[in-house]
Amino acid sequence: MPEPDLHCLGGRGLGLHHHQRQQLKGWPDLWLVGDKPSPRARSAAMAPASPPPPPNQTLALSDGLLLRALACLPEPHLTGAASLVCRRWMRLAGRLRRRLAVRDWAFVTHRLPYRFPDLADLELFPASIAAPTALPHTSPLLTCGEVSLTLDPSADPPLGACRFLDDDVLDRGLTAVAASFPNLRRLSATAAAESGGLMAIACGCPTLQELELHRCTDLALRPVSAFAHLQILRIVAASPALYGTGEDGGVTDIGLTILAHGCKRLVKLELLGCEGSYDGIAAVGRCCAMLEELTIADHRMDGGWLAALAFCGNLKTLRLQGCSRIDDDPGPAEHLGACLTLESLQLKRCQLRDHRGLRALFLVCEGAREIQVQNCWGLEDDMFALAGLCRRVKFLSLEGCSLLTTRCLESVITLWSDLQSLEVVSCSKIKDEEISPALSELFSNLKELKWRPDNKSLLAASLVGTRMGKKGRVFFKRKILPAHQRIKGKMLNHSTGAAA
């Protein structure tokens, strides 16, 4: 028989050498048989056993029944508290999620299709921006919507050009999205130099209706023509200052012509920072016969593009946002034409200092029934007087027009016999005491009036119906309820009986 090992653990009267015991002192939770256990081990052994967790009552419910119950929850609870109950609830809540904004590109190619298999609205642009590695973690963030950019306080300017992921990484992610989400309806992504990713989206997502494409160039718009059912398109052109592209990047007449010939079912088109001229807008108007809403923001177009709006035969809404100029050279008025179907003209945060450009805009939109001017610069009396060229206006909204006076406003709106609604907000030079009897009569015939040109008018409007400004005894007169009257009567009867 083999000899017993004298150095084994647990033998009575047998032990380890002194140096071996010293080596085990670094393990406080390990003791030898025959030795005294540590105080921590004794307390753990003497502690009462924890009660078993209560049974999960939802295990008796099928996935289909639980999905119907979770579908009744509003979106914040569905994505928040319900997903934290257990793994099963997290998986089922992910199946009900329809919209998601991704911030980590690694999640796109790995866990996204398993965590949220039925997405219809996917925002990939925030995840396509590469995080800077050289900046410390305490650097401030600049957040705009779903996008957060890291600032470098030591640099001038602190916000440099955005650094995006490599084009092959973007293409692989878009290919994975196309293979996993065939029912995708809306997508926001970053255009790559190669067109493989967007072509995969066009082939794998046949029901895609809305596309938002950032860092666009003329070449990046080639695969957009493959989207057969695209109805809403938002293009953010590549800007050298923000995206770090070359001076020849961006969207010109070439890119506008490409998308016009490919996306003939467009209903809404938004162009941000795009170049181009008469030819590009004319191509969009000729080919996109269903176009109803056109938004042009911060454009860099050449002179003469306003005349091309006459080719948009079904256009109903024209919106200009953040434009430093309208049209430098609109050409003769007889060559401008007009949008006969236009219903709404909206100007937001635009420079309205060019008399020729603004006059050409109102001539093209002379049939507009709704005019909105919000926080625009340079809208003085002589500039706003050009709005009188539009004779069919039914709704006028002015907000933040601090240079406009009451007399000019009256001279324009009295020309509009069809005016039904008027909104004047934060126009400091429009005064209540300057309202003439004719203007008061016009106000009385309106169906809707929102009059808050300054703080004083805002206060006066807010006091209507509150009986504020009356004497204190009238305003603070207590309203006695029937129950109070009964209690008061009982108290009077009781006091009368006691006195008797």
Predicted regions and their residues:
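C-terminal capping region of solenoid repeat domains
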Residues: P2-P37, P48-A49, A131-D167, D171, ...
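Catalytic cores of nucleophile-dependent amide-cleaving enzymes
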Residues: L271
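N-terminal adaptor-interaction module of cullin-RING ubiquitin ligase components
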Residues: P2-A191, S195-P240, G244-T245, A260, ...
